[in-house]
């Protein structure tokens, strides 16, 4: 085991605070509408330019191990806030730095760190209640666009794209952000359920120009096993032919004789048909087949349920107004499933999302939820250079997450105004002077956002804070973009409650841990042993006889 270096008390906290300051100072320059960019060197390729707090935080690694510990703790604040709310990473970093700085001063003055922590916790709980009480629910597309615009640093087009996407696919729908191949940013919406499996044979195509199989008002047969021959299916195939409607078979696989027979019948024109592999694997495949069954009002043909292919009747098949199948994807639009059944399935998947601890499972469940609940929208981010595209993609990701958070918990006045106002509403009292000091630490820290936004805009922070607090209106704040004071919500400058709340709670949590730290342990740096050079050759004097 390597030897360790240990630092105690004030020395430890000062080292840690220095690390916190280095990371926070690099991140906080990005805050607000006039925040600056940070350029990050890459080991290969062009450097990356970003205004995304968490991207900056993730790149910082300090040489001094004790300083690095402080920096990494604050990095954790940014990452955790990003994971939960999807935005607010810079906010969380600024708050954490402010609480740690003030807390460190209090500990150095001889106050009890544990009482300071209790005071901080009391104040944060009261601020969270105040934020939730002030929250304004958002409903219109304009309000959604406002949130997106603010989070994308004033890019109105981003706000509009996100609002349009959410309008088309619903609040639960999946919206993905991809890099475009062109200079323009565009929005593409896929309505209905789409999964990543295409036709099993190109002979099923109905539109040879586009290589797409479009089947209108089709029946859907869902089978969880492989289909190798069609003998067992003949009764149901004949019943479908009688109706004159097309049929889409979704099964684990359709192979050999079964596939050949279907293709021959399709080419002869007797049967409008297409076959597709079922999406997913294992248990997830079963669940997704069940989702498709509920969406189309059909039944999954499964031995587990005691249903055999021979006994399948027309009413066990699903129905859909339109099914489009390309080489890679299948899209089911307007399934005939009962609304109540779909809502029940959505509620069931939501419950599974709450319970799961795996990020991968959660992501897959959210995809399934979106496919049932609305559809999928893709925002393709364009730009003149690769660096510009990456920077815009960062901003759109943030804006999208902020917008989702706003829909969930509502909005409050932006620009740090909500927290600044909350600092005057803290009425809770500590049981002793040290707890009271902890409450005051939070009061002062809540001003740090407005101060930093003003500083980044080149304004005098103290004057801005004073002017805002002079007015008794909760919505009154400072628009750093235009340099005007006024009603923040009317000006469209808003923050999602979830983002502000998460940032404050995470910042206070980690800052409290740093304040109550009394010892730090790190590995001693390894001493490099002297290099193993060539042995001494005695001045090479022994070579004289070689001449």
Swiss-Prot record:
One GO location term (cellular component): cytoplasm
Catalytic activity: ATP + H2O + a folded polypeptide = ADP + phosphate + an unfolded polypeptide
Function: Together with its co-chaperonin GroES, plays an essential role in assisting protein folding. The GroEL-GroES system forms a nano-cage that allows encapsulation of the non-native substrate proteins and provides a physical environment optimized to promote and accelerate protein folding.
Entry EC number(s): 5.6.1.7
GO terms classed as biological process: protein refolding
Enzyme class: isomerase
GO MF term set: ATP binding; ATP-dependent protein folding chaperone; isomerase activity; unfolded protein binding
Annotated SUPFAM superfamilies: GroEL apical domain-like, GroEL equatorial domain-like, GroEL-intermediate domain like
Quaternary assembly: Forms a cylinder of 14 subunits composed of two heptameric rings stacked back-to-back. Interacts with the co-chaperonin GroES.
NCBIfam families: GroEL, PRK00013.1, PRK12849.1, PRK12850.1, PRK12851.1
InterPro entries, per the entry: Chaperonin_Cpn60_CS, Cpn60/GroEL, Cpn60/GroEL/TCP-1, GroEL-like_apical_dom_sf, GROEL-like_equatorial_sf, TCP-1-like_intermed_sf
Compartment(s): Cytoplasm
Keywords of the record: ATP-binding, Chaperone, Cytoplasm, Isomerase, Nucleotide-binding
Name the record gives this protein: Chaperonin GroEL
Domain of life the protein comes from: Bacteria
Gene3D superfamilies named among the record's database cross-references: GroEL (3.50.7.10), GroEL-like equatorial domain (1.10.560.10), TCP-1-like chaperonin intermediate domain (3.30.260.10)
Family, per entry: Belongs to the chaperonin (HSP60) family.
Pfam families: Cpn60_TCP1
